[in-house]
Amino acid sequence: MRFSEKFDVIIVGGGHAGTEAALASARMGQKTLLLTHNIETLGQMSCNPSIGGIGKGHLVKEVDALGGAMAAATDEGGIQFRILNSSKGPAVRATRAQADRVLYKAAIRRRLENQPNLWLFQQAVDDIILEGERVAGVVTQLGLRFESKAVVLTAGTFLAGLVHVGLANYQAGRAGDPPAVSLAARLREIGLPAGRLKTGTPPRIDGRTIDYSVMAEQPGDSPVPVFSFLGSAEQHPAQLPCWITFTNEKTHDIIRSGLDRSPMYTGVIEGVGPRYCPSVEDKIHRFADKDSHQVFLEPEGLTTNEIYPNGISTSLPFDIQYQLVRSIKGLENAHILRPGYAIEYDYYDPRGLKSSLETKAIRGLFFAGQINGTTGYEEAAAQGLLAGANAALYAQEKDAWWPTRDQAYLGVLVDDLITRGVSEPYRMFTSRAEYRLMLREDNADMRLTEAGRKLGLVDDVRWEAFQRKQEAIEREQQRLRRTFIHPQHVPQEQLQQVFGKVLEREYSMFELLRRPEVSYEALLSLPQAGEGEADPQVRQQLEIVAKYQGYIDRQAEEIERLKESEHYRLPLNMDYSEVHGLSIEVQQKLNKQKPETIGQAGRISGVTPAAVSLLLVHLKRKSRKAGNTADQVA
């Protein structure tokens, strides 16, 4: 049966990628349908109850700067907030929040249900409708045919999902949810390059059976941080601490005793797990010299006693899980509410995607989230927003948009995926970005909100707040540059207190703010300083720009130097065997991967700087023959 309504964009899946994709497409004015197997699980946090962290918090801020929901929902559902790396430079500082699962999910669903241009429908998708090499819609379990111009697949771990506990396994998308077996088979039938990955989760514990008195308490930060640029601490519900304990030699012996029944160590699981979120059995194998590992006990919410023991993800048999949990200090009488498990699932080689996250093989079909080989809510949300926005642009027959590596962590994420592919679940870190001083959490709006506004992703409220912030920063910067502090007009004791020494001459306030030891707040305590700005976001920007301007300028110059070759377009139908001087290995890799730009080509493993030079020569030669200049990205 054909559904009566036709849509511009269909989103398959209601996790973190799917919800951001649906909201983005609808914000851009496209008639959007979100299909999910269960409306009750929209925005569900399937694994740990936290958002953000190193690199991940940066992605959340970028999603927020583009009008996305994740940061705002975290502000409404966050029960503990911390700034990680607070003692380090601004490039690597990152926000992390524990979230109440129920409140977070409710905040996401409320946004979905109240978003104009967005329809929700509860049905699992079994098939994709193709017309030649173009997508035309989807077919659900009931045989309902939904037609659309573009489709975004955000299937998470559901594609041929297989849950493992010990040597027992069963088909599931996650514990308690059915897998997408028919859809997985259909995608493989189409011939897209597939592989298997795995991820895992720890057993959940009843907090009433935990002895917190023998553990270290880990409170949140004060004053309490916020995630969204439009957020405030008043939005946060009650705040709770986390607790820290450790595994021990007894724990490790118990784990070793069960390895002969581990699906990972007996070869039952084929998929590769995440390097940076390993199972506890993987930890004791990889770090055999360590006699203990940290375990963070994280509350799942304000209205439940359920605790998430971060650090002991496992797929060992339940009897081993029971023993290992009870061997940990403070958990001697712990009651397990849900067993830990591993889940194995299909993913598709992201080198088969364009920078827009559209598949190269099928026009109008976009992938986002774990289907692309990533791990993490934040990575999924960022991809979802980008895929949803580009699906909306595709439906309008407009050019695709994506941020570059020097513009956003989202740009780094996508570029890494489509040029290098994945051999294990991909997690974002600040170390993956060459220009991380430019890509700070605090300036995500400065980098992306204007682009989001042009795309139609950013509403009037956010845009007006952003403009006010920009104007306040510019106004105060000018004031700091023209306001001077004269040492004769300030008591010596106060100068000593603020600057650690006496000033020898007159300085502008901006010059003084550039000093590492001088804060904006301390500067305003001087009698000639004036009132200053009250907005903490404005204050933060003023201080960072003053102190790091030299480094930022040098990085900007480096980016400009690289842009010329970085952005040269490569034709997707180019035959690299025709490029004189390229090795057979490089020819094969380029013909297989079909990079879109010279920059992408240079980041493919095995493609040397010499090979890039040959490509540039080849392009210029062809360009001269054609009588025009090489096409460059605008």
From Swiss-Prot:
SMART domains attached to this UniProt entry: GIDA_assoc_3
InterPro entries (UniProt xref): FAD/NAD-bd_sf (IPR036188), GIDA_C_N (IPR049312), MnmG (IPR004416), MnmG-rel (IPR002218), MnmG-rel_CS (IPR020595), MnmG_C (IPR026904), MnmG_C_subdom (IPR047001), MnmG_C_subdom_sf (IPR044920)
GO aspect biological process, one term: tRNA methylation
Location, primary (coarse class): cytoplasm
GO-annotated cellular components: cytosol
Record carries keyword Cytoplasm: yes
Molecular-function annotations in GO: flavin adenine dinucleotide binding
Residues given in the record as FAD binding sites: 13-18
Domain of life from the UniProt record: Bacteria
Cofactor(s) the protein needs: FAD
Localization (cell): Cytoplasm
Gene3D superfamilies: FAD/NAD(P)-binding domain, GidA associated domain, C-terminal subdomain, tRNA uridine 5-carboxymethylaminomethyl modification enzyme MnmG/GidA
Biological role stated in the UniProt entry: NAD-binding protein involved in the addition of a carboxymethylaminomethyl (cmnm) group at the wobble position (U34) of certain tRNAs, forming tRNA-cmnm(5)s(2)U34.
Subunit record text: Homodimer. Heterotetramer of two MnmE and two MnmG subunits.
Name of the protein: tRNA uridine 5-carboxymethylaminomethyl modification enzyme MnmG
Originating organism: Methylobacillus flagellatus (strain ATCC 51484 / DSM 6875 / VKM B-1610 / KT)
Taxonomic lineage from the root: Bacteria, Pseudomonadati, Pseudomonadota, Betaproteobacteria, Nitrosomonadales
